[in-house]
Amino acid sequence: MLIWNNSDGSTLPPTPALQQVYAKWHKFAARMTDHVATMYGSEHWEAQWAAIVAHYQALSFRDLVRLPALENWDADAPGNFGGLGMSPEESAIFYAIGIGDGSWGAFYDVCCLYPLRTAIFGFSSHLQLVHGRVDEQGNPLQAPYLGEAVHDSKGLRFASPNYLGLATLDECLLFMEISELEKSLYTHLLQHQDGLLTDSSVCALSKLPSGKVRVQYQWNVSNPDKTTPLSADFDAVIVTLPSWLIETNVRLEHFTPTMLPSSIINAYKTAHWETSCKVYASLKKSFLRKNRRIPQILVTDSFVHDVYAYQYNDNYAYDCILLSYTWEDDATKLASLSDTELANNCVKELDRILLRCTNMGQPISPYVDTDNARVQRWVTDKNALGCAKLYRAGTYYDAVSLMKYNRDLAEHSGLYLVGESFSVDAGWTEPCFRTAVDAVINICRTTGAAFNGGFSMDDYPHYQVEV
């Protein structure tokens, strides 16, 4: 087993072949990001980005990896930065184990603009683990409703906030007091009979002659004996669900082609949602405390692909291990196994790999409790039907058309598209925030609200699609 100790973030991979793959990606990325850094925010930036899009939007990342490298950027072809120039053998390494950071295979058959945006705009740099709203020992700080029961506007109880992990972001936005209002969003919503509804599944959106949108939903949906069909009418409806669910779970009625053009419908129907599968299990504390041989992170070219061990604080009896992290075809091929079979097979495969390696020679199975395994299959999760909304080669402009919708057509339909489904940077929190702000700005514009700070829509950029 090759060992790569890279705690400083600048140590090269351990073999010439890996170093070559590493160098080709970093040379390409550095050339592009360095140039973008000189242009971004200037009067020339929009033209530069349009040229990049025009040059690369029809290429898959697989194509970009094999495309010959370009030694010098040419101002007469401003969108062309060449490719990575990898051989078939180097491409196979890049697909399977990346540059030591895990498989890049998830990106191979999507539009190359997605990984390019991820790289040049810094989404993949300086990543931080969100522990939550906690002290140095990992204990939650005092916060509203911590350890208390919470109920929605109709009295249904829902999960109380723990202020742990990434969910803390949602919990703080809902339960923490907004200083200007001297109350939380949760408190505000409870003042209205239908302000906050949980366990409610939207089944239809109907455009009414009055201009309002009727939202039909099943209330108390997890309790079949008490499920009740209800509806409510709104001036504006913000749509945040995964785009495939619009087609499979929600009826759209009485929206004219002017309100909802066929091109928009086609864009969200044909969006590409990546499949992904994660296999978690409980991990004995002794693995990370006493084991000095098996690495904390393993990147393999077997069906398990990537493995990560995570150390919880002492309040937890066990740590956690991600036994397998896969995307796309590598995740789909695991569908033939039950959750129990998959967890057990992952441990057996890791044991096989470790026992064959002369510098390992010991199994991982004694540390892993597969009886407490959890498998997340995003494509069969009824609330997701996919893990991240990306886009195929040639469909970047379709994705951008969904981002344009709020400004161009939402005032006619009453629908505002928000979240990962309607972005070109899926998988990160940034597009969710950006599209949320976009919806608020456009609702303010539609309702004639006064903007603060001298802001006007003239200051707000237009998303550009192919002419």
Q: Language-model features: where?
A:
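N-terminal glycine-rich phosphate/pyrophosphate-binding loop and immediately adjacent elements
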Residues: 1-45, 50-54, 251
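Active-site/ligand-binding neighborhood in enzyme catalytic cores
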Residues: 40-205, 211, 219-222, 233, ...
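Conserved flavin/dinucleotide-binding core of flavoenzymes
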Residues: 212, 282, 291-467
